[in-house]
């Protein structure tokens, strides 16, 4: 099982470019485009690479400030949500990182922030070091749609990860509307898995199809009896009608078969839910998988009524690019 630097890293990265996160405005990104903050891949160093403005850096970098003030970037999150923690990553910024940074947030049902917007400080100014990750827990259950990332007074940051729980207004979903209850954009969250040696479990809930093997969940080769698995909390309770298991890009390393269990869980911690999952009812019996293919199951699904969590079992190991769990919302 992967070791996380902070417990909140298991939550969805609301500031992931793959979810649609982007810069709305920025005071200065002369040296490096601020939208690089949201790339899902770790920052890289390119030795000897320069562009018209100077050394190419994988992140956001502003000019050296020669007057009072500080730099800031206004960000629209790909999906609104409550924030559990952040990682301000200054990888490869050594003599050019900001000494400190802070984070503000707001929620707008539509439109973009303006001069009348009321911002809430979710992370007061914290000290930064060069070439380092800075993990900070945030306890705020309010949903936010936009962030204002402030760096004092200037400099460069490689990545900004904002981990939290996506928010969706489920009252707007029709009674007969079929939605992907496991999608990250709908609040689905990967809680735990047996192993994620080659790819994070949360990748399987991202929108679209995977761009490569690294954009999926892949386990190490199993050398002991048993099988690998991942547990997903659905964004909303629902009755499941269709399941899609996508092995795109996985050719010599896809699972032989898969099955899915489901349950309606009331309360409990992630670790307690992990233990309970052994005894959940069968939602989808074992199904043969093929390499590099989308597998759709409907008639094979058992009627369990409303469920809140599923457990995808893969036999014996391997990689899955995406998992879709479609059904009707239980109200």
Swiss-Prot record:
Keywords, ordered alphabetically: Hydrolase, Purine metabolism
Recorded catalytic activity of this chain's protein: allantoate + H2O = (S)-ureidoglycolate + urea
InterPro entries listed in its UniProt record: Allantoicase (IPR005164), Allantoicase_dom (IPR015908), Galactose-bd-like_sf (IPR008979)
UniProt keyword RNA-binding present: no
Domain of life, per lineage: Bacteria
Catalytic activity, EC: 3.5.3.4
One GO process term, biological-process aspect: allantoin catabolic process
A GO molecular-function descriptor: allantoicase activity
Pathway(s) where this gene product acts: Nitrogen metabolism; (S)-allantoin degradation; (S)-ureidoglycolate from allantoate (aminidohydrolase route): step 1/1
Pfam families associated with the record: Allantoicase (PF03561)
Enzyme class: hydrolase
NCBIfam families in alphabetical order: allantoicase (TIGR02961)
Family: Belongs to the allantoicase family.
The protein, known as: Probable allantoicase
Organism: Pseudomonas fluorescens (strain SBW25)
Record lineage: Bacteria, Pseudomonadati, Pseudomonadota, Gammaproteobacteria, Pseudomonadales
Gene: alc
